[in-house]
Design a protein with these regions (language model features):
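Short amphipathic alpha-helix used as the core "switch/output" element in two-component signaling
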Residues: 45, 68-80
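Conserved phosphotransfer microenvironments
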Residues: 58-72
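Acidic, metal-coordinating helix/loop segments flanking the phosphotransfer/catalytic sites
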Residues: 11, 36-54, 62, 76
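Two-component/phosphorelay signaling modules centered on CheY-like receiver
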Residues: 17-35
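Negatively charged, flexible loop motifs adjacent to catalytic sites
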Residues: 89-93
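A Lys-centered signature of the CheY-like receiver
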Residues: 108-109
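Non-catalytic signal-transmission and effector/linker regions of two-component phosphorelay proteins
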Residues: 1-11, 76, 113-143
Length: 143
């Protein structure tokens, strides 16, 4: 399988089993490879050994850590990892903190088309950024 035809890998973190299953099913139907993580601890374990094209993470994980901490950990392991924070809480402090960290927020209940559109946009941006970096590297080599 070439790099262009490989499935995008998405890590989905949510502590509610039904929500995690729903996201997984929707994304797999659209052709994505999904790795579900039911806790911040499991997400960290998975991130220790795998790389992903996108991270979808619930804000409230029912633990000591929030989705912000999971995303920060992931970006420490994989700088530049596109991330979407999902939350049912509407508040300026959440939006401001996310914006400051370069994290997009989707508010629950999530509209499926908005959900899929945000995922496509983040993956497309990541691919464009990678292609641009490769082009710059080749240009510098030929000088």
């Amino acid at each position: 399988m070439t790099a262009r035809t490989r499935k995008h890998r998405i890590l989905v973190v949510d502590d509610e089993p039904s929500v995690l299953t729903t996201y997984r099913m929707i994304l797999e139907q659209k052709g994505y490879e999904v790795v579900p993580a039911p806790s911040a601890q499991e997400a960290r374990r998975v991130l220790e050994g795998d790389s992903f094209d996108l991270l979808l993470c619930d804000l409230s994980l029912g633990e000591k850590e929030s989705g912000f901490e999971v995303i920060e950990f992931a970006r420490g392991r994989q700088p530049g990892l596109p991330s979407l924070l999902l939350t049912g809480y509407v508040g300026k402090n959440i939006s401001d903190r996310a914006q400051g960290l370069g994290i997009s927020v989707l508010f629950k209940p999530v509209d499926i088309q908005e959900f899929l559109g945000a995922i496509r946009a983040h993956l497309s941006f990541r691919e464009q950024k990678a292609a641009s970096s490769q082009w710059i590297a080749r240009s510098e080599e030929s000088e």
